[in-house]
Amino acid sequence: MKKNLMLIFGGVSFEHEISCKSAYSVYLALLDLNKYNIYSAYIDKCTGIWYLLDSVSDPPKPIDTDVLPIVSLLPGFGIFSNNKNLEIDVVFPVVHGRTGEDGAIQGVLKVMDIPCVGAGIIGSAISSNKYFCKLLLKSFNIPIVPFIGFRQYDYSLDKEEIKRNVKEVLGYPVIVKPAVLGSSIGINVAYSENQIESCIEEALKYDLTIVIEKFIEAREIECSIIGNEKMKIFSPGEVVVQDFIFYDYDAKYSVIPGNSIIFNIPAHLETNQLLSIKEYAFLVYKNLELRGMARVDFFVEKKSGTIYLNEINTIPGFTDISMFSKMCSHDGLQFKDLIDNLIDYAFQSYINRKKRINFKD
C-alpha cells in the first residue's frame, strides 16, 4: 500500500522561486518512483498560507489562490484540506531559506508528530545562522575564516567601534553577510573603509544579525552527505566562478553553467586536502546532529591551500544545476534513488525518536 507524502515548497522567502524549481525536480522523481501518493502543498510568498495543488510544474504556472483549497494543520489530528484528513505519513520540505531551513517547519512537523525529510530543529536552526554556527564550529576546532558578528542594535549604538573592529581584527577586503539567508542574497564585498558602511546597511535590510569575514581568494568546494547516524560522504565538487567576484545569487541562478560557471566533479584536490574536507564534513554532520542530508561548503585558499569551512545547507537545492545531487550522481546514486533514500532516513529518524520516553505515568 502506498504511503501518503506531502511535498512542501514555496515559502515567504527570497528563495521562493528556487524552491519551486527544486520541488519540480523532486516531484518528477516521486512520480518515477511510484511508491507514494503525492500531495503538493504550496506556501504563498506574500501571505504564508498553505494551498493544496494537483501537481508541480516548471516553470511554475500562475497560481490562483482564490480557488485553491487551503491546507490546515491540526496537532493531534493531522493535516487537512477540504475538510478531509489527508493522513500524511511523511513530509518532504523543499522550502529554502527562512521558515524552511531555520527549524520553523521542522518544529511544526515535530508538534504534528509527522516524519520530516532532513535535519531536525536544532541542526536546522544552527546551520542556518552563520554567526552562531561559526561560534559552534570554532568549539569543534574546525577551521573557519576570521570573522566578527554583531546585531543591528549594537551597530546603532556605536557604528564607529564596529568599523574599527573590522579594520583592526580583519583588515580589508572583507565580505559582509546577513546571518540568516541563503543563496548568497544580501552579500557584498567591501574593499575599503569607505565601502563598509554601505555594505552593512545593505545586509541589515535582510537580517538583524550581520557577519563580516575576511575576504580570501579561494576555491569553492562543496561536499554532499546523506544519512543519519550512519552517513555517506560523496566525492567533493568544485564550483569555478570565472566572471564573478564570488559565487553570488546571480552566478548561482542567472548564468548558464559552462559559460561563466564550471562544475568540476570530483574536485581536483591533493589527497590530504580531500581527506581533511571529508573529515571536517563528518565532524560537522555528527556534532550538529544533522539528519537526512546536507551540503557542506568549504573554501580552499588559493595561495596557501588552507581549508576553511564556509557554511552548511540542510535543504540544498534540487534544481537541474544544483551541486548536491550532481555529486551524489557522480558516485553512482541516481536522483530518484537519492530522493527515496532521503524519505527512508526520515522514517528511520522518526522511529528512533519515538522510542524515547517523553513522560512517566
Swiss-Prot record:
Localization per record: Cytoplasm
Gene3D superfamilies with a match to the protein in the record: 3.40.50.20, ATP-grasp fold, A domain (3.30.1490.20), ATP-grasp fold, B domain (3.30.470.20)
Cofactor binding note from Swiss-Prot or TrEMBL: Binds 2 magnesium or manganese ions per subunit.
Catalytic activity: 2 D-alanine + ATP = D-alanyl-D-alanine + ADP + phosphate + H(+)
SUPFAM superfamilies per UniProt: Glutathione synthetase ATP-binding domain-like (SSF56059), PreATP-grasp domain (SSF52440)
Any one Gene Ontology molecular-function term assigned to this protein's record: metal ion binding
Cofactor (UniProt): Mg(2+); Mn(2+)
Keyword annotations: ATP-binding, Cell shape, Cell wall biogenesis/degradation, Cytoplasm, Ligase, Magnesium, Manganese, Metal-binding, Nucleotide-binding, Peptidoglycan synthesis
Pathway: Cell wall biogenesis; peptidoglycan biosynthesis
GO biological process per UniProt: cell wall organization; peptidoglycan biosynthetic process; regulation of cell shape
Residue numbers binding ATP: 167-222
Any Gene Ontology CC annotation: cytosol
Residue numbers binding Mg(2+) 2: 311, 313
UniProt-listed Enzyme Commission number(s): 6.3.2.4
UniProt enzyme class: ligase
Residue ranges constituting the ATP-grasp domain according to the UniProt record: 134-344
Keyword Glycosyltransferase among record annotations: no
Binding, Mg(2+) 1: 297, 311
PANTHER family listed in its UniProt record: D-ALANINE--D-ALANINE LIGASE, D-ALANINE--D-ALANINE LIGASE A
Family: Belongs to the D-alanine--D-alanine ligase family.
Role summary: Cell wall formation.
Protein name: D-alanine--D-alanine ligase
Species whose genome carries this gene: Borreliella afzelii (strain PKo)
Primary gene name: ddl
